[in-house]
């Protein structure tokens, strides 16, 4: 199955007298997936190719499952009838599909064009939102959440991502206008910025996109809906964009550069804790940018990539780059001990590589 293809099937309980198709697969449902189907019989099930095209994932509207074919030495007997007095053997089956809940893996590659202040005239080519959803091994709701949190917008029916420089210029503008209009960041309506945006020739769709990515709605059931700008989240994005363009830098120097770049309300907030999972210490006193998006999804290749960067990791630092490999903490810890050796010292707990890679 190609990465941009999908096959939708509707799972329904068959009537006992219905014929069993000669083409079938047995699917083992875990409790969570079974509950979903029982509560919503019309739930759409989508099979998609993983990024490496060597495996498939199963997606409901909001969850993603890894799919693995299990081959057995014994067999399942499949009967036409459920009557205990008149069973007719239809076929035997030596394998079934096993599903395991995982995090959807979403990566925005060069198929999604950047949109910036010059794009109004250029009209870059991109994908539609539905095309993008079909191309990534994740559920629709997981993709929707990712797009909203990462500065993506739909423009002229196509999906675009805002460029980092354009994002920062819009955020700088938002904070300047907010100060002029005495806007309370803890509770305000987006529409109050629309006229200033038009006056200053900012694309309103882009402004909304940025606001949605750095703020959260206030859940008070009062209309019109109001939002709260998250200053720590805003600080995070400035730090991430800044570090992404730097090869290696001392931690103290980076914090100073980061703080200098921020709008006034975010001054003093920079901390490396905000960037966990987006940097690693290449030396004890210097850091480099690293994002999970750059790392393979398959566990052995993920650990291989990490241990090729350095053979010894502080446990907490390594955890930030492998925590998405499984939903349960115990499963992640088991993977760490499978591919690494734990070492305890006065400076903390470290994980050393088990292999030469």
Swiss-Prot record:
Functional summary from the UniProt entry: Essential for the fidelity of chromosome transmission. Required for the DNA replication block checkpoint. Replication factor C (RFC) complex has an essential but redundant activity in sister chromatid cohesion establishment. An RFC-like complex (ctf18-RFC) is formed where ctf18 replaces rfc1 in the RFC complex along with the association of dcc1 and ctf8. This complex is required for efficient establishment of chromosome cohesion during S-phase. Acts as a PCNA loader, loading PCNA onto primed templates.
Q: What does the UniProt keyword field contain?
A: Cell cycle, Cytoplasm, DNA replication, DNA-binding, Nucleus
Its chief place of residence is cytoplasm
| UniProt protein name | Sister chromatid cohesion protein dcc1
Keyword Oxidoreductase on entry: no
Q: Name one Pfam family in it.
A: Dcc1
**GO MF:** ATP hydrolysis activity; DNA binding
> Where is this protein localized, as stated in its record?
Cytoplasm; Nucleus
Q: Which family does it belong to?
A: Belongs to the DCC1 family.
Q: Which domain of life is it from?
A: Eukaryota
Q: How does it assemble?
A: Component of the ctf18-RFC complex which consists of ctf18, ctf8, dcc1, rfc2, rfc3, rfc4 and rfc5.
């Amino acid at each position: 199955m190609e990465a941009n293809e999908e096959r939708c099937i509707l799972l329904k309980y068959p009537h006992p007298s219905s014929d069993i198709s000669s083409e079938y697969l047995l699917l083992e449902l875990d409790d969570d997936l079974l509950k979903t189907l029982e509560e919503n019989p019309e739930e759409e099930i989508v099979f998609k190719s993983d990024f490496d095209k060597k495996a498939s994932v199963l997606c409901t509207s909001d969850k993603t499952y890894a799919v693995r074919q299990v081959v057995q030495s014994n067999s399942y007997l499949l009967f036409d009838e459920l009557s205990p007095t008149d069973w007719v053997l239809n076929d035997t089956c030596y394998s079934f599909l096993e599903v395991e809940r995982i995090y959807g893996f979403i990566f925005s590659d060069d198929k999604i064009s950047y949109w910036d202040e010059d794009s109004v005239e250029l009209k870059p080519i991109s994908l539609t939102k539905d095309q993008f959803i079909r191309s990534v091994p994740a559920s629709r709701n997981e993709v929707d959440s990712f797009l909203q949190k990462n500065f993506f917008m739909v423009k002229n029916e196509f999906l675009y991502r805002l460029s980092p420089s354009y994002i920062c210029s819009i955020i700088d503008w938002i904070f300047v206008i907010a100060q002029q209009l005495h806007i309370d960041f803890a509770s305000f309506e987006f529409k109050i910025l629309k006229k200033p945006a038009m006056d200053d020739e900012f694309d309103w769709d882009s402004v909304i996109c940025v606001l949605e990515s750095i703020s959260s709605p206030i859940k008070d059931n009062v209309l019109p809906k109001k939002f709260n700008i998250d200053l720590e989240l805003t600080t995070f994005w400035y730090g991430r964009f800044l570090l992404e363009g730097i090869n290696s830098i001392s931690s103290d120097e980076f914090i100073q550069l980061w703080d200098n770049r921020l709008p006034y309300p975010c001054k003093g907030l920079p901390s490396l804790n905000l960037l966990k999972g987006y940097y690693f210490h290449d030396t004890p006193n210097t850091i480099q940018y690293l994002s999970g998006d750059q790392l393979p999804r398959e566990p052995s290749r993920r650990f291989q990539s990490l241990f090729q960067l350095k053979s010894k990791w502080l446990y907490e630092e390594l955890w930030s780059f492998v925590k998405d490999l499984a939903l349960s903490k115990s499963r992640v810890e088991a993977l760490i001990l499978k591919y690494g050796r734990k070492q305890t010292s006065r400076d903390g707990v470290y994980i050393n590589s088990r292999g030469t890679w």
